[in-house]
């Protein structure tokens, strides 16, 4: 009877948790693709996390995500005195809940070593037990043999890189040469590593951003400091596991954290254009024009560097609009701005041209 009395409140809590409202996210789109909101790095009690696996699904559903990976550590099992070591347990527990709530659940594990090589997530694996190997390269090889996407986690984490600067070591270069490294975390938890943008560009790797959550997500990323968890935006052909995986290997990813978007140069411009619209001038006094600039996304767009005769700075609020007043010459000559919160490199942001729509 005691067991029954204990279990009933637990199941009621799970039901109430998952029945909460889902937050619908409005993010930039890449023409011809579906934007999947993803978090590929999180933990449960089956390694060093503090929550049961099904809670990760409930949190993801409420936060408006499309896909997640529970990536408990292979080598680090601080709860093993109380919870048996089972590298597939979290995925098995979370899978039926994910199916009920239309969350794509990627099977993954975190290979956990000292730097170098550091910590790496193996995503889309089938047999995590095969990653239990003394030799690091053998562990990665086993993951790759299963079709895994290998992500280098928090390369500037100060526990492993005291100065916070990510560096490529010989082992990482070897992984790249073998085709065994596919992405690097630009953003992890509450940290970002600017040099990762250049590393990914120079080595043709995907830019990744994840929460690395261990506790309750709403507590670790609580308002008003955080409006949402960090996430990877994946531009897939369809909302399926297969399309998700294809897009990640094709490096069609961006990272959304706070009010910022980090994306490769070739993706950044179309992403901006997908949410920003300039209207037809509604006033023209012969010297100046007035037109509206609107934003359909959750991300405010922060523009700077406007030339003489146009606003020096503009912030187009999330789901908002601003009126732009500029010299009439800009009817034929676009205004060039830097988008300060769309990052394309360690020292680079997106440059765009703004002009009113034609009648």
Label the predicted regions.
Residues 1-8:
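Bacterial N-terminal signal peptides that target proteins for export
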Residues 23-149, 153, 161-162, 166, ...:
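A metal-dependent hydrolase metal-coordination microenvironment
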Residues 9-11, 60, 330:
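Amphipathic, positively biased hydrophobic alpha-helical segments used for protein targeting
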Residues 11-19:
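Hydrophobic h-region of N-terminal signal peptides that target proteins for export
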Residues 15, 43-45, 335:
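Compositionally biased, intrinsically disordered low-complexity segments enriched
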Residues 2, 21-38, 57, 115-125, ...:
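Charged catalytic cores and adjacent phosphate/nucleic-acid-binding surfaces used
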């Amino acid at each position: 009877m005691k067991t029954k009395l204990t279990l009933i409140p637990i199941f009621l809590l799970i039901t109430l948790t998952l029945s909460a409202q889902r937050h619908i996210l409005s993010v930039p789109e890449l023409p011809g693709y579906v934007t999947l909101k993803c978090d590929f790095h999180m933990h449960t009690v089956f390694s060093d996390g503090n929550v049961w696996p099904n809670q990760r699904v409930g949190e993801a559903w409420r936060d408006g995500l499309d896909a997640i990976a529970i990536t408990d550590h292979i080598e680090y099992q601080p709860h093993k005195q109380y919870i048996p070591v089972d590298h597939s347990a979290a995925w098995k527990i979370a899978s039926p809940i994910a199916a009920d709530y239309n969350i794509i659940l990627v099977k993954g594990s975190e290979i956990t070593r000292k730097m170098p090589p550091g910590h790496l997530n193996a995503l889309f694996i089938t047999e995590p037990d095969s990653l239990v190997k003394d030799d690091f390269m053998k562990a990665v090889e086993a993951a790759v043999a299963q079709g895994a996407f290998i992500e280098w986690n928090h390369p500037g984490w100060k526990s492993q890189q005291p100065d916070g600067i990510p560096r490529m070591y010989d082992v990482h270069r070897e992984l790249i040469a073998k085709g065994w490294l596919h992405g690097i975390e630009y953003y992890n938890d509450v940290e970002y590593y600017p040099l990762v943008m250049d590393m990914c560009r120079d080595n043709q790797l995907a830019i990744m951003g994840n929460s690395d959550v261990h506790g309750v997500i709403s507590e670790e990323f609580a308002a008003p400091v955080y409006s949402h968890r960090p996430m990877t935006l994946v531009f897939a052909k369809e909302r399926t596991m297969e399309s998700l995986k294809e897009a990640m290997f094709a490096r069609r990813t961006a990272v959304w954290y706070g009010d910022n978007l980090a994306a490769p140069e070739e993706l950044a411009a179309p992403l901006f254009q997908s949410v920003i619209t300039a209207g037809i001038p509604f006033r023209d006094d012969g010297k100046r024009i007035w037109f509206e600039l609107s934003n359909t996304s959750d991300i405010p767009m922060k523009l700077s560097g406007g030339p003489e005769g146009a606003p020096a700075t503009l912030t187009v609020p999330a789901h908002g609009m601003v009126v732009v007043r500029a010299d009439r010459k800009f009817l034929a000559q676009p205004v060039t701005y830097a988008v300060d919160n769309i990052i394309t490199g360690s020292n680079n942001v997106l440059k765009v041209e703004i002009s009113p729509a034609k009648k």
